Amino acid sequence: MASNPPSAASPRRTAVSPGADRPDGPDPAGQRQSYHAGRLEPEQLATTWVEQFARWFADASTAGAGVPEANAAVFATASADGRPSARTVLLKGFDHRGFVIYTNYTSRKGRESAENPFGSLVFPWYTLERQVVAIGAVERVSRTETEQYFASRPRGSQLGAWASHQSQIIESRDVLDARAAELAARWPAGTPVPTPPFWGGLRLVPDTVEFWQGRTNRLHDRLRYRRVCTADRWAVERLSP
């Protein structure tokens, strides 16, 4: 059906060039990368998403891949009223149950995961022209898992977990340094540092895991594992790029 012509009262729209008010510098609209590193077909996929992720994670973790931190991912959450937030985190484990990260539970991601327990992880492996996107529910890992992982951390990281009241406003860096010094005196070298009660693991339990491979002309390959029932049965689907 043809749309009605604008009335005399309709405001006239003026075309504005993208970025007209931005500061001088590189123009993001002019930056283009052609993708041609590989392809992804259904017959190439592993039987399960976790096996496929393990393959790609191994590829990204090799020195020749040029990926600085293969376990780095963007973790997106949202508040109870739907306001999103995102940040880069480090993956610390994965298996058939999902992907595990660790954080301060009083941080923004910790609070949002409690009040709106859903999230997404994006692994951007740029040099391989690959991306993995997982979406699903977020749950806390067991205290046993948390304590086992915390015990494996470097002592400085353990003290840092106690020192940082993550996501809270502080007056200066001096506040952090003073807390760190106080905690180092409380637990001197050789003394086990206990796991903070406000710190622990989050597991993203995926409903979908999408594997993206860049292709020429923006006609990328997108293959998705999707949970189809509670019995852990999965469908594999190709998505239009």
From Swiss-Prot:
Q: Which pathway does UniProt place it in?
A: Cofactor metabolism; pyridoxal 5'-phosphate salvage; pyridoxal 5'-phosphate from pyridoxamine 5'-phosphate: step 1/1; Cofactor metabolism; pyridoxal 5'-phosphate salvage; pyridoxal 5'-phosphate from pyridoxine 5'-phosphate: step 1/1
Q: Which domain of life is it from?
A: Bacteria
Q: Return the cofactor note field.
A: Binds 1 FMN per subunit.
- Give the UniProt keywords, A-Z: Flavoprotein, FMN, Oxidoreductase, Pyridoxine biosynthesis
What top-tier enzyme class does this entry carry? oxidoreductase
Listed GO biological process terms: pyridoxine biosynthetic process
Swiss-Prot/TrEMBL catalytic activity: pyridoxamine 5'-phosphate + O2 + H2O = pyridoxal 5'-phosphate + H2O2 + NH4(+); pyridoxine 5'-phosphate + O2 = pyridoxal 5'-phosphate + H2O2
Task: For the region Disordered, give the residue spans.
Answer: 1-35
Q: What is its EC number?
A: 1.4.3.5
Q: Name one GO molecular function term.
A: pyridoxamine phosphate oxidase activity
InterPro entries linked to this entry: Pyridox_Oxase, Pyridox_Oxase_CS, Pyridox_Oxase_N, Pyridoxamine_oxidase_dimer_C, Split_barrel_FMN-bd
Obligatory cofactor(s): FMN
Query: Which positions bind FMN?
Result: 87-92, 102-103, 108-109, 131, 166-167, 212, 222
Residues annotated as binding substrate: 32-35, 92, 149, 153, 157, 218-220
Q: What does this protein do?
A: Catalyzes the oxidation of either pyridoxine 5'-phosphate (PNP) or pyridoxamine 5'-phosphate (PMP) into pyridoxal 5'-phosphate (PLP).
Q: Which family does the record claim for this protein? A: Belongs to the pyridoxamine 5'-phosphate oxidase family.
Oligomeric form and interacting partners: Homodimer.
Full protein name: Pyridoxine/pyridoxamine 5'-phosphate oxidase
